[in-house]
């Protein structure tokens, strides 16, 4: 007969079973301790975003009593709609629902934007931690989470760091298609981001990564080892988990080496895939770093009227054309918020 003491400890406690379930690798979807934080924050951000995108009233984004409509119920469509950033009247103040005198005031001042952005930021950081956690439990290396840190850094730059540097959440990127375009145009006007070296590295990372991905995929697809007849798809010959190579890396290496030159092609599959991961990740890191420095007005290069002839007359360059375009965009945005051509805020 089992004693009461042994019977008490024979069945694990509810907390112990919960901990085992959270950390279990046998779940269809891994939860993890970062997932315990990720799930409620991302669900909150997604729910509030959907509701606000559909039905939020106009927001006084500039703090001058001129509300901007962003939701579908107030005349927008999928392209023009957005969750409008928190009002400039709020600035960087923490603005939860209980800080407003009423729900209408909270909505008028753009409270949903701050709620979404803060929960979203915690959620994506938790997702990155969850990637590391699952990799650790499976005995894998941690580079999946490191790669994901690039989009996390980019989102943090436009939603958190830039508003902090500019002094108001109203300067954050709107949560919508046209709002994103407006953010990009105003960012160019105020910071000349196209002339910033870190943005150039980001462009090289994104477009270069796309090029390298397309090149790698097409080379592999073109050098598959056929395991089927001519009447069957070549893809049928692959069995998940097979030990044999699925493509001829020697043939792919030889083709690319002859197409360009010998040392342009990788002869090591591991170094090749490391390069494919590193190139876009480092580029996006630099872009995020550039946006974060421009948040504090360390802007792109300004070569305004830098080329002159022997008589001192200006010879216009494309840099001068860009500067003229920047001035045009600058004077047209927030045109009722200030009385000077340049934004003196």
Swiss-Prot record:
Protein name: Photosystem II protein D1
E.C. code: 1.10.3.9
Modification after translation: Tyr-162 forms a radical intermediate that is referred to as redox-active TyrZ, YZ or Y-Z.
A GO MF label: electron transporter, transferring electrons within the cyclic electron transport pathway of photosynthesis activity
Subunit and partners: PSII is composed of 1 copy each of membrane proteins PsbA, PsbB, PsbC, PsbD, PsbE, PsbF, PsbH, PsbI, PsbJ, PsbK, PsbL, PsbM, PsbT, PsbY, PsbZ, Psb30/Ycf12, at least 3 peripheral proteins of the oxygen-evolving complex and a large number of cofactors. It forms dimeric complexes.
Pfam assignment, any one: Photo_RC
Binding site for a quinone: 216, 265-266
Further information: 2 of the reaction center chlorophylls (ChlD1 and ChlD2) are entirely coordinated by water. Herbicides such as atrazine, BNT, diuron or ioxynil bind in the Q(B) binding site and block subsequent electron transfer.
BP terms from Gene Ontology: photosynthetic electron transport in photosystem II; response to herbicide
Secretion signal, residue range per the UniProt entry: none
Residues passing through the membrane, by range: 30-47, 119-134, 143-157, 198-219, 275-289
InterPro entries, alphabetized: D1/D2, Photo_II_D1/D2_sf, Photo_RC_L/M, Photo_RC_L/M_CS, PSII_D1
Record-listed Fe cation binding positions: 216, 273
Originating organism: Euglena gracilis
Gene3D superfamilies to which the protein is assigned, alphabetical: Photosystem II protein D1-like
GO CC terms of this entry: chloroplast thylakoid membrane; photosystem II
Cofactor note: The D1/D2 heterodimer binds P680, chlorophylls that are the primary electron donor of PSII, and subsequent electron acceptors. It shares a non-heme iron and each subunit binds pheophytin, quinone, additional chlorophylls, carotenoids and lipids. D1 provides most of the ligands for the Mn4-Ca-O5 cluster of the oxygen-evolving complex (OEC). There is also a Cl(-1) ion associated with D1 and D2, which is required for oxygen evolution. The PSII complex binds additional chlorophylls, carotenoids and specific lipids.
Residues annotated as binding pheophytin a: 127
